[in-house]
Amino acid sequence: MKTVQVNIVTPDGPVYQADVEMVSVRAESGELGILAGHVPMVAPLKIGAVRLKHSGSTELVAVSGGFVEVRPEQVTILAQAAETSDKVDVDRAKSAKQRAEEHLNHPNESDVRRAELALKRALNRLNVAGK
């Protein structure tokens, strides 16, 4: 099967680079499955897991929003933050989840949106880490 080169980059530098058979991302417009030869496009991403399929296995990378740029033989994901499943600090993600839930249980108008986003990021990281 043909492959597409994937690069996931954050402001801190590259997080993931490999040739894969398929990339799946959660764009603002919905789920996108990208194969080699895909039509060029750019789409904003939601907080979610990027699924990278190759050699019969699937790798997960947690991304906190950003953009995906698709070219026929290359996919570049520019994310505000990204972590591969083996790099997720599970204890830190659980603590962030707990703090966000506490803020949501005792809401202050200015904190609600921030707490919702923090909770989504923490749950995404835990999902990618398989916890």
From Swiss-Prot:
Record's bilayer topology term: Peripheral membrane protein
TM region(s), chain numbering: none
CDD domains assigned: F1-ATPase_delta
Gene Ontology molecular function terms on file: ATP binding; proton-transporting ATP synthase activity, rotational mechanism
Listed GO CC annotations: plasma membrane; proton-transporting ATP synthase complex
Keyword set, alphabetical order: ATP synthesis, Cell membrane, CF(1), Hydrogen ion transport, Ion transport, Membrane, Transport
Pfam families recorded: ATP-synt_DE, ATP-synt_DE_N
Main location: membrane
InterPro entries membership: ATP_F1_dsu/esu_C_sf, ATP_synth_F1_dsu/esu, ATP_synth_F1_dsu/esu_N, ATP_synth_F1_esu_C, ATPsynth_dsu/esu_N
First and last residue of the signal peptide: none
Compartment(s) of residence: Cell membrane
Assembly and oligomerization: F-type ATPases have 2 components, CF(1) - the catalytic core - and CF(0) - the membrane proton channel. CF(1) has five subunits: alpha(3), beta(3), gamma(1), delta(1), epsilon(1). CF(0) has three main subunits: a, b and c.
Role: Produces ATP from ADP in the presence of a proton gradient across the membrane.
Family (UniProt): Belongs to the ATPase epsilon chain family.
Protein name per its UniProtKB record: ATP synthase epsilon chain
Organism, as annotated: Bacillus pumilus (strain SAFR-032)
